[in-house]
Regions:
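Acidic (Asp/Glu)-rich catalytic clusters
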Residues: 55-62, 79-86, 107-112, 137-142
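Active-site-adjacent beta->alpha loops and helix N-cap segments on the catalytic face
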Residues: 97-111, 126-131, 155-167
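Hydrophobic faces of well-ordered beta-strands that scaffold small-molecule active sites
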Residues: 30-32, 65-70, 89-93, 117-121, ...
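Catalytic alpha/beta core domains of metabolic enzymes, predominantly
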Residues: 152-259
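Alpha-helix-loop-beta-strand connector modules within alpha/beta enzyme cores
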Residues: 43-67, 112-116, 164-178, 231
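Glycine-rich, proline-tolerant flexible connector loops at the mouths of alpha/beta enzymes
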Residues: 29-53, 152-155
Length: 274
């Protein structure tokens, strides 16, 4: 096997293995990658159509929702086929501040093809109270699976997050899940995620918290799956299989750590102010 072919085979095994471990760990929503306009390359988690994921999903678990992300203006959804249930269950649409209307339009076309839809309101910290109420009103009309607060620049402190969460919770219909997607520019990703969960602990609002193994993500990275699930097990009576999560880290994450760098650093800690 050539070195290039061997590397592709390795990357395919990593993607497949991580998805398999996460579903065995009882993770409810597994984001498998992105949908992009370009054709899928073997061993990449940038897909063109949902069938590209069939290589990586080793027997769907009915308790899991398998998701891919799209940027509101970087994917031609006309190529998206009707949902046949074999790979993706849902698509997360991320849109920037002041582009909610456009994001919901593409979301509507995706929903019409039989996919569940989640929305990510990037840079939610930029929204005023009236902006948040208007966003909630639009989301209520659409009726997606959920809407996530996104701390795009890792600039939020707990009071910022809870202020936004309170407004959205007060105005979102109760059958719509509210989520939080953190970035770790100030090393606040885990702390804010815990605060978000604790705030809703006595609520009947269903919530979501985004995380990744070892906090892997662009730049400063995200909240870590291993810490979030441990916290939820110990403090909120959840039943995530930490052995599967830690085994995924031992088996697969070394490969990423050798090739890529992410996580807190001083430049990222000051970048959110500029």
């Amino acid at each position: 096997i050539s070195s290039a072919a061997s590397d592709v085979y390795k990357r395919q095994g990593v993607i497949r293995g991580i998805i398999h471990k996460l579903q065995n760990a009882n993770i409810e929503v597994i984001e498998c990658g992105w949908l992009k306009d370009s054709e899928n390359k073997e061993g990449s988690s940038f897909y063109h159509v949902p069938s590209d994921l069939l290589t990586y999903i080793d027997g769907k678990k009915k308790e899991c929702t398998y998701v891919a992300m799209i940027d509101w203006n970087r994917y031609d959804d006309s190529v998206l086929p009707e949902n046949d249930g074999t790979s993706l269950d849902a698509i997360r649409v991320v849109f920037p501040y002041q582009k909610a209307k456009e994001g919901l339009k593409i979301g509507a076309r995706i929903k019409a093809k039989g996919y569940k839809v989640f929305f990510q309101a990037a840079n939610t910290l930029a929204y005023s109270e009236s902006d948040l109420i208007e966003l909630a009103d639009r989301i209520n009309v659409f009726k997606p699976e959920g809407l996530s607060i996104v701390d795009t620049f890792g600039a939020m402190y707990e009071d910022d997050l809870i202020r936004i969460a309170k407004i959205l919770d007060a105005h979102l219909d109760n059958d719509i899940r509210l989520g939080f997607h953190s970035h770790n520019n100030q090393q606040m990703a885990f702390a804010n995620s815990m605060a978000f969960v604790n705030y809703f602990a006595e609520s009947n609002r269903n919530i979501m918290v985004d995380s990744s193994l070892c906090g892997m993500g662009r730049g400063a990275g995200n909240a870590t799956t291993e810490l979030i699930t441990s916290f939820l097990n110990r403090k909120h009576h959840k039943n995530y299989n930490l052995d599967e999560i830690l085994d995924a880290i031992d088996t697969y994450m070394v490969w990423f750590e050798e090739k890529f760098k992410w996580g807190y650093s001083t430049p990222y800690s000051v970048s959110y102010t500029h």
